[in-house]
From Swiss-Prot:
Residues 325-691, 748-762, 809-1223 are extracellular. Residues 154-159 are annotated as: Interaction with spike glycoprotein E2. SUPFAM superfamilies: E set domains, Trypsin-like serine proteases, Viral glycoprotein, central and dimerisation domains. It comes from O'nyong-nyong virus (strain SG650) (ONNV). This is Structural polyprotein.
Length: 1247
């Protein structure tokens, strides 16, 4: 990066530059060789000692006393003498000896900074740092050095900096820079600079414009920052600086910073002569003395950058600068006046020319405040003085005062007026469909004006509340700030048109008398030829009638607002002025309520929320897996909601509270180490589908085997009894009859035999009942004695990305991309003791590369005052304005309050214009359309290495290496090139949306992008709002038009939930810059280069023998819910690494201290019901066996710290039951097969 200087410091400031022999050219330097640092230090100490030991003379004290005594006499002297004394006192106050820090900086700055001048004035400074010369980009002018002025500078608008390579012969003058900035005090030209909380601050007044480019030094004389400007924060001023953080240059810009380059005079124009805008040539050029000439001069310079300086100078009427106050903010209104304009509804259902006509209603503030523009002026009296309690309105041709207390605003109910100034009113109103403004004049007559206006206070946050709470949460919002100071917002004003007034004419016999009443009147009569002119005294028109004349009052001493409800001055044309308006829209924070915490009940893979909303509150939740499955619902009354918690986790947001996160535990009601029904219940609650499938398959297999056994027995029986059935008179042997259950002719039924035994021989009856029980006991004993008939069935494949063992110090491993879960890896190297590395992701940031296409916001339609051409035809001129429309309408006959505006009936034309501009709210309320490209991934990793926990940050690209002590770590790239951002995204107020927006220059009316601009402050604007001018209504002066509604406001209503709530994998979306944080997707490979010195040889490590492991308790799928006791004997005292060689078991302790014969307790975490794992301590391994029980908590608020298994394992108890059941069924099948084989063999032998 070009803005990072290299360290080419030769210590010239503290010791002489090393001497080098020049071959031929001898360079003679005019500067004397500086002394060594020790000499400088001695001089400084001696100077400080002399200052400390010097006695303070008493004479100045007497002088001060005499001055105080003379002040009483000076008060009695003339004002002329006082003016002469004042400059002398100021000069004596300026003479102040620099402090120690200032002297030190001046000494260091002697070589390394150079003045930047423009037209002989110092506008800032350039500084030599490292191998670069650096100058703030906003400082205009050239460096006051012949060699540096010729350099080609590279400019960075991002850092507001220009830099170039230092000439070789000047490198010795450069200062060293550093990125080390511990909190404390630093030095600059004006004294001490405090660095705290990442900000540089100074006492207010210590810095000023012209200090831009000055360096800030540490106590070693190294540059830590370069000053660009400052922001006044009361007693302290926060500095805007460019500084360095390791290898990265950064810019610190506090809010409200002002550039500290010396302001250059801005020039204005008057009669082809330029002059400084702050010093008009007519000395003094004062509005009170020459109002018309002053307004004309301002109109000529309305597009000049120094227009407002010229306006202030014309109104101040003084060459001396005065302190600004609230009254001065109202001073600009002395050049304007209120006016009468057309109102569609004056309160009784009819239109009129109202003194409180509504011009514009602004509702961009998200806190619900309305900004209303009307035709009267508030806070100004008719004598142009300021008075908060008054307002002035136009009554006929004359402004009249009224009390401000009579002003009111109303929608569906009365509104609360929160601020007034000039033409503007701030009000907080309830929702409604119309807006009415009105006032009561001095004669107690009420004037109102009503407009259709749909008002609904916007929603801030996720709760629909009605009043601000005392306690809550601060959310960003926007409001109209209550300040009357000059802002960047402005309105256009122009000369008022001639106002027709037929009451000035009276008919006297055959003549017309015009009574001017102290006004300037323009008249035109069509009798005995053309008779027209401009008069200031009464005039009589002979041989004429009133109907043949037209009179209008003209006034060019004041401006009025450029309203579409009043005509444009026909003589002035497009001439106009501008004035600042109050109450700008600013970003702020609003306090919103926080909903009551819900009552939470945890169930198996479910969470139940009992909600108590005080007002309509939004509930939303999403899964933190691949498919977010986002849901939201407005809750208006008490309600109980049950939500399923997926294995990946659940995020629930209730109102304005912070999100709640839940993860399910593998909890069940059964146990994996109990009876068959408990085991079945255990697995059924964990994995119902798999359990049902396995049980169904096992049942089918058992049923098949039993059926097979029965079939073989039936076949053997049939083989045995068939020969006897075919032989006449054959008798079946008793034993065969018993085995084959053959019923003899004399045998009774089982019921008859049982009845007989019960009646005659009860002991035999009980013996017969014991036969099946004896058979069952015999079968069980056979199963116990039967060797294992089948091998253990494996129902799952334990998959894990656990530890890997390598035999080299170049180690590579893969860790899951899950934040907050520790991961351990074992590094084994022949001849060395094993080393355990523990790594834990603190955060993972995915930041896409963005390209800003445009910003869009709300537009405003500019409709200047229409140009009415009386008795003629007007023509449109092409103008390069966004969505510009111009139309000429013929046959108009407009009226003003004093009568018809034109003398002609049908030959009049009206030229209507309209175009679109960005609204004033675009500086705060806008959406940015970005194209997103390849994303970079950075990770913050905690590494436990050599007994220390160290946190490092690195780019996870597989190339960027970071050093942890003496080991080198290379992280990435991610296994999955996934991003939550689409190719096109929209950013609005800290929220990000995936949206396929229209490209630049292709916006459609009423949709997102109907107005487009490159930046909020740029002048290039594209607009397509379907603006169509319409014919004005007969008799009224207005500019009607049709236009599509704002696409930006429509998008705000329909935009839906942002990526903050809908992104998969639990991503947290942030802005400035746009990034996704902690997306749990994929794996991250890590390559580790460990030096030989980090390993411990086996001969140096303690030897551990006689190890035994006993698990005291174990709860699987819990946060280190297992505890094992390992007994050992160590050869010597030392430290041993502890590691689990089983993938599915994680041990919390990375290493332990061993000594002699002792025991240690280790905590482990596993997802296995029966954990069989090996623990390695130093180079010795021991086998551990654990019987784990399910956790008691169904839901927890942290992710699992162990390896998650897709399917649970089979416990040893379950396997024992499987073996028994399988062996029993197998034995039955084997016996049946044996019987069948014997029967078949006997049968075949007889034949």
């Amino acid at each position: 990066m070009e803005f990072i200087p290299a360290q080419t410091y030769y210590n010239r400031r503290y010791q002489p530059r090393p001497w080098t022999q020049r071959p031929t050219i001898q360079v003679i330097r005019p500067k004397p060789r500086r002394s060594r640092p020790a000499g400088q230090l001695a001089q400084l100490i001696s100077a400080v000692s002399r200052l400390a030991l010097r006695t303070v003379p008493q004479k100045p004290r007497r002088t001060r006393k005499t001055k105080k005594q003379k002040q009483v006499k000076q008060e009695q002297q003339s004002t002329r003498n006082q003016k002469k004394k004042a400059p002398k006192q100021k000069q004596t106050q300026k003479k102040k000896r620099p402090g120690r820090r200032e002297r030190m900086c001046m000494k260091i700055e002697n070589d390394c900074i150079f003045e930047v001048k423009h037209e002989g004035k110092i506008t800032g400074y350039a500084c030599l740092v490292g191998d670069k010369v650096m100058k703030p980009a906003h400082v205009k002018g050239t460096i006051d050095n012949a060699d540096l002025a010729k350099l080609a500078f590279k400019r960075s608008s991002k850092y507001d900096l220009e830099c170039a390579q230092i000439p070789v012969h000047m490198k010795s003058d450069a200062s060293k820079f550093t990125h080390e900035k511990p909190e404390g005090y630093y030095n600059w030209h004006h004294g001490a600079v405090q660095y705290s909380g990442g900000r540089f601050t100074i006492p207010t007044g210590a810095g000023k414009p012209g200090d831009s480019g000055r360096p800030i030094f540490d106590n070693k004389g190294r540059v830590v920052a370069i000053v660009l400007g400052g922001a006044n924060e009361g007693t302290r001023t926060a500095l805007s600086v460019v500084t360095w953080n390791k290898d990265i240059v950064t810019k610190i810009t506090p809010e409200g910073s002002v550039e500290w380059s010396l302001a250059l005079p801005v020039m204005c124009l008057l009669a082809n002569t330029t002059f400084p805008c702050s010093q008009p040539p007519c000395a003094p050029c004062c509005y009170e003395k020459k109002p018309e000439e002053t307004l004309r001069m301002l109109e000529d310079n309305v597009m000049q950058p120094g227009y407002y300086q010229l306006l202030d100078s014309a109104l101040a009427c003084s060459q001396h600068r005065q302190r600004r106050n609230a009254r001065e903010n109202f001073n600009v209104y002395k050049v304007t006046r209120p006016y009468l304009a057309h109102c569609p509804d004056c309160g009784e259902g009819h239109s009129c020319h109202s003194p409180i006509a509504l011009e514009r209603i602004r509702s961009e503030a998200t806190d619900g405040t309305l900004k209303i523009q009307v035709s009267l002026q508030i806070g100004i009296k008719t004598d142009d003085s300021h008075d908060w309690t008054k307002l002035r309105y136009m009554d006929s041709h004359t402004p009249v005062d009224a009390d401000r207390s009579g002003l009111f605003v109303r929608t569906s109910a009365p509104c609360t007026i929160t601020g007034t100034m000039g033409h503007f009113i701030l009000a907080r109103c309830p929702k409604g469909e119309t807006l009415t403004v009105g006032f009561v004049d001095s004669r107690r007559i009420s004037h109102t004006c009503m407009h259709p206006f749909h008002h609904e206070p916007p929603l801030i946050g996720r709760e629909k509340f009605h009043s601000r709470p005392q306690h809550g949460k601060e959310l960003p919002c926007s409001t109209y700030v209550h300040t009357t100071a000059a802002t960047t917002e402005e309105i256009e004003v122009h000369m008022p048109p001639d106002t027709p007034d037929y009451t000035l004419m009276t008919q006297q016999a055959g003549n017309v008398k015009i009574t001017v009443d102290g006004q300037t009147v323009r008249y035109k009569c069509k009798c005995d030829g053309s008779n027209e002119g401009l008069i200031t005294t009464d005039k009589v028109i002979n041989n004429c009638k009133v109907d043949q004349c037209h009179t209008a009052v003209t006034n060019h001493k004041k401006w009025q607002y450029n309203s579409p409800l009043t005509p444009r001055n026909s003589e002035q044309g497009d001439r106009k002025g501008k004035i600042h308006i109050p109450f700008p829209l600013v970003n702020t924070t609003c306090r919103v309520p926080k909903a009551r915490n819900p009552t939470i009940t945890y169930g198996k893979n479910r969470v139940t929320l009992l909600l108590y909303p005080d007002h309509p509150t939004l509930l939303s939740y999403r899964s933190m897996g691949r498919i977010p499955d986002y849901h939201e619902e407005w809750i208006t009354s008490k309600k109980e909601i049950s939500i399923t918690v997926p294995a990946e986790g659940l995020e629930v947001t209730w109102g304005n509270n912070d999100p709640y996160k839940y993860w399910p535990q593998l909890s069940t009601n059964g146990t994996a180490h109990g009876h068959p029904h408990e085991i079945i219940l255990y697995y059924y609650e964990l994995y119902p589908t798999t359990t049902i499938a396995v049980l169904a398959a096992a049942s089918i297999v058992v049923a098949s085997l039993v059926s097979l056994s029965l079939g073989m027995c039936i076949c053997a029986r049939r083989r045995c009894i068939t020969p006897y059935e075919l032989t006449p008179g054959a008798t079946i042997p008793f034993l065969l009859g018993v085995l084959c259950c053959v019923k003899t002719a004399k045998a009774a039924s089982y019921y008859e035999a049982a009845t007989y035994l019960w009646n005659e021989q009860q002991p035999l009856f009980w013996l017969q009942l014991l036969i099946p029980l004896s058979a069952a006991i015999v079968a069980c004993n056979c199963l116990k004695l039967l060797p294992c008939c089948c091998k253990t069935l494996t129902f799952l494949a334990v998959m894990s990305i656990g530890a890997r063992t390598v035999s080299a110090y170049e180690h590579a491993t893969v860790i899951p991309n899950t934040v907050g879960v520790p991961y351990k890896t074992l590094v084994s190297r022949p001849g060395y003791s094993p080393m355990v590395l523990e790594m834990e992701l603190q955060s993972v940031t995915l930041e896409p590369t963005l390209f800003l296409d445009y910003i869009t916001c709300e537009y405003k339609t500019i409709t200047p005052s229409p140009y009415v051409k009386c008795c003629g035809t007007a023509e449109c001129k092409a103008k390069n304005l966004p969505d510009y429309n111009c139309k000429v309408f013929t046959g108009v006959y407009p009226f003003m309050w004093g009568g018809a505006y034109c003398f002609c009936d049908a030959e009049n034309t009206q030229l209507s214009e309209a175009h679109v501009e960005k609204s004033e709210s675009c500086k705060t309320e806008f959406a940015s359309a970005y194209r997103a490209h390849t994303a970079s991934v950075s990770a913050k990793l905690r590494v436990f290495y050599q007994g220390n926990n160290i946190t490092v940050s690195a780019y996870a690209n597989g190339d960027h290496a970071v050093t942890v002590k003496d080991a080198k770590f290379v992280i990435g790239p991610l296994s999955s090139a996934w991003s939550p951002f689409d190719n096109k995204i929209v950013v609005y107020k800290g929220e990000v949306y995936n949206m396929d927006y229209p490209p630049f220059g292709a916006g459609r009316p009423g949709q997102f992008g109907d107005i487009q601009s490159r930046t909020p402050d740029s002048k290039d604007v594209y607009a397509n709002t379907q603006l169509i001018l319409q014919r004005p209504a007969a008799g009224a002066i207005h500019v009607p038009y049709s236009q599509a509604p704002s696409g930006f406001k429509y998008w705000l209503k329909e935009k839906g939930a942002s990526l903050q709530h809908t992104a998969p994998f639990g991503c947290q979306i942030a802005t400035n810059p746009v990034r996704a944080v902690n997306c749990a997707v994929g794996n991250i490979p890590v390559s580790i280069d460990i030096p030989d010195a980090a390993f411990t040889r086996v001969t140096d490590a303690p030897s551990v023998t006689d190890m035994s492991c006993e698990v005291a308790s174990c709860t699987h799928s819990s946060d280190f819910g297992g505890a094992a006791v390992v007994k050992y004997t160590a050869s010597k005292k030392g430290k041993c690494a502890v590691h689990s060689l089983t993938n599915a078991v994680t041990i919390r302790e990375p290493n332990v201290d061993v000594e002699g014969t002792a025991q240690l307790q280790i905590a482990f975490s596993t997802a296995l019901a029966s954990a069989e794992f090996k623990v390695q301590i130093c180079s010795t391994q021991v086998h551990c066996s654990a019987t784990c029980h399910p956790p008691k908590d169904h839901i927890v608020n942290y992710p699992s710290p162990h390896t998650t298994l897709g399917v649970q394992d089979i416990s040893t108890t379950a396997m024992s039951w499987v073996q028994k059941i399988t062996g029993g069924v197998g034995l039955v099948v084997a016996i049946a097969a044996l019987i069948l084989i014997i029967v078949l063999c006997v049968s075949f032998s007889r034949h």
